[in-house]
C-alpha cells in the first residue's frame, strides 16, 4: 500500500551531469494548500526538455533553478481535492513542472481529465509533444491537403506524431531522419538526414515543401530551409542540436522571402490563456483516440533507476523504440 504521508522524489540540487545533480529523496508530505489538488503519480516520462533543464541549457538555466524536481508531464489519480472539478480517484494528466515524484500538488489549471482506460505509458505522453504537434498543425500552420510539410528529427516521438497526423488530417509530409531504413511507415517520402535533402527530393520526384518544422536548429535546420521555395514558411520549435543557425540560413530565408518564426508551447499557453489551452487539449485527445494516434513506450523503469534511463537515452548505440517511462517506487 502506498504511503500517503511520505513522498519519494527525484531532486535536482544543481545544474550538470545527472549522476552528480540528481538524488532520490524521501520527504514528509505537508498539508495540501486549499487552492491545489494532490495527485498520486502513476507514470511520468523523460523528454529532451527534462535533460536540458537538468543540464541548465538555454532558457532552462533561468526558468528552472535548482533545487527542484524535474519532469514536465505525468498521469495520475487525484487523492485529495477541494476543487469541484476534480474528485478523488479522478484520472488526470498533470501538465506542470515537478512530476518526477510520487505525489505532486497541482493547480487545477494544470490538470486535464482523461479516460480511465488509457494506458499509463500513453497517457503520460499526451501533453508536451502531443499538444505541440496538434497546435502546430491545426492552429499555427492550419495544414490542409494542398500543403506539403517537411520535418526533421523524423524518428523522434514528436516526428512520429506529425507522420500520423498527416494521415488523419490529410496533409502531405516529407520526413527527414537519420534512420531512414528503420522508419515505421509505408510512405516513400522519407529522406536521409545524412545526404543532401534537395537532391533527394528531386531524385524521388517529390513536390516542393510549403512548410518546414525544425526541431533541431544548427546545421540540420539550415539544410532544411533550403528545401523550401519562394515564400515558404519555416517554423523552429526546438534546438536539439544546441547550435545556432549558420549565416547561410538567414541569407537563404531573405533571398526567398521565407516566413520564419519560432514556436514554444509555454509561450503559446501564456498568449492564449487557460481556457483555450483546455479546449485544444480536449479536441486533440478526442482526435487522437478516434484516429488511433500511437505514442510509443520503449520500457518502464522505477524512479530509483533514473540514471539507467538517462544513460539509455543518451547512448549513441542504443536504439529506443519509444519513450522511457518512469514509475513511482
Name every feature range the model reports, one short phrase each.
Residues 2-5, 40, 271-329:
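C-terminal hydrophobic helical "lid"/dimerization subdomain
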Residues 127-194:
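Mid-domain Rossmann-like dinucleotide-binding core that forms the NAD(H)/NADP(H) cofactor-binding site
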Residues 72-73, 91-153:
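NAD(P)H dinucleotide-binding glycine-rich loop of Rossmann-like/cofactor-binding domains
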Residues 28-45, 57-98:
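Glycine-rich beta-strand-centered segment in the early N-terminal region that forms part
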Residues 219-290, 328-329:
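Glycine-rich phosphate-binding loop and adjacent beta-alpha segment
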Residues 85-86, 143, 228:
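Short, well-ordered loop/turn sites that connect or cap secondary structure elements
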Residues 196-207:
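Short amphipathic alpha-helix with an adjacent loop that forms part of the alpha/beta core around
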Residues 176-180, 215, 238, 264:
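N-terminal Rossmann-fold cofactor-binding loop
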Amino acid at each position: 500500500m502506498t504511503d500517503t504521508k511520505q513522498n519519494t522524489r527525484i531532486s535536482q540540487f544543481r545544474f550538470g551531469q545527472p549522476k552528480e545533480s540528481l538524488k532520490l529523496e524521501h520527504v514528509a508530505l505537508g498539508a495540501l494548500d486549499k487552492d491545489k489538488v494532490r495527485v498520486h503519480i502513476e507514470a511520468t516520462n523523460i523528454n529532451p526538455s527534462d535533460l536540458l533543464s537538468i543540464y541548465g541549457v538555454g532558457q532552462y538555466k533561468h526558468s528552472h533553478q535548482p533545487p527542484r524536481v524535474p519532469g514536465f508531464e505525468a498521469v495520475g489519480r487525484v487523492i485529495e481535492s477541494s476543487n469541484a472539478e476534480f474528485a478523488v480517484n479522478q484520472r488526470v494528466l498533470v501538465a506542470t513542472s515537478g512530476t518526477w515524484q510520487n505525489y505532486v500538488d497541482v493547480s487545477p489549471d494544470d490538470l486535464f481529465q482523461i479516460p480511465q482506460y488509457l494506458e499509463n505509458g500513453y497517457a503520460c505522453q499526451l501533453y508536451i509533444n502531443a499538444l505541440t504537434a496538434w497546435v502546430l498543425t491545426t492552429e499555427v500552420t492550419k495544414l490542409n491537403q494542398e500543403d506539403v510539410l517537411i520535418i526533421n528529427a523524423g524518428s523522434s516521438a514528436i516526428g512520429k506524431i506529425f507522420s500520423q497526423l498527416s494521415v488523419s488530417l490529410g496533409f502531405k509530409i516529407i520526413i527527414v531522419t537519420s534512420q531512414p531504413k528503420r522508419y515505421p511507415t509505408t510512405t516513400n517520402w522519407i529522406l536521409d538526414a545524412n545526404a543532401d535533402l534537395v537532391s533527394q527530393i528531386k531524385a524521388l520526384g517529390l513536390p516542393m515543401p510549403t512548410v518546414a518544422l525544425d526541431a533541431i536548429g544548427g546545421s540540420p535546420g539550415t539544410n532544411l530551409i533550403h528545401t523550401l521555395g519562394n515564400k515558404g514558411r519555416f517554423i523552429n520549435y526546438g534546438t536539439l542540436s544546441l547550435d545556432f543557425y549558420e549565416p547561410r540560413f538567414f541569407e537563404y530565408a531573405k533571398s526567398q522571402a521565407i516566413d520564419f518564426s519560432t514556436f514554444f508551447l509555454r509561450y503559446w499557453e501564456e498568449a492564449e490563456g487557460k481556457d483555450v489551452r483546455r479546449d485544444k487539449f480536449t479536441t486533440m485527445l478526442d482526435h487522437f483516440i478516434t484516429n488511433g494516434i500511437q505514442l510509443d513506450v520503449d520500457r518502464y523503469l522505477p524512479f530509483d533507476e533514473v540514471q539507467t534511463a538517462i544513460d539509455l537515452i543518451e547512448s549513441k548505440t542504443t536504439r529506443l523504440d519509444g519513450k522511457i517511462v518512469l514509475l513511482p517506487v
